[in-house]
Amino acid sequence: EVVTIPFASQIPALASGRATMAWTTFTVLPERLKQVDFVSFMQTGSVAAVKPEDKDKFTKKLDLCGRAIAVQTGSSGDVAADSISAECKAANLAEIKKQIYPEPKDSIGAVLSGRAEAWLDDSTAAGYFEKTSKGQLVVTGDSYYPSPLGVAIPKGDKATAAMVEALLKELMANGTYKKLLDNYNMGKSALEAPVVYTDVSQLN
């Protein structure tokens, strides 16, 4: 059974036993590994997506300093915004004015309406929106803090981890994985093989 629940509720659902897995754009982060395990399926980083006419204003990370930036609560963009703000402060620049929204569509809407100047999220989500919206927002600058994306599963659930790992290996071996990523302009985010993450030490 597939059930749609808010992003911020998915890890709690796994931890409480209400869900068997959560498949979305979860960046594998140390704080998340304390609650769940992951099977990686892509490599990504946080990127800024802006209106096409603003693309040249955001060519490097510190260009985000002092700007109104929209993020989804609990997302990699949310975490990245805090890290970039710390770098801004260290460089004696104004910190990011972070706007937190419950869903990506709300962050996107904030930029399109002019309430925010950029949307900070993982490169897959931002790249997908750029392609499917025909460039209403465009990805600009570099990818920040590259990390694996993973399917989240309950902590210690080795059987589900093995099942997901085997599925991904099969999709990679038969070419389906590459075909899907290329179709959405995400080929650069491909992995050679999935990895089961159970401990923070694996991220070092």
Kindly label every feature range from the protein language model.
Residues 2-12, 56, 97-109, 145-147:
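Short helix-initiation/N-cap motifs at beta->coil->alpha
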Residues 43-50, 131-168, 187-204:
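Periplasmic-binding protein-like
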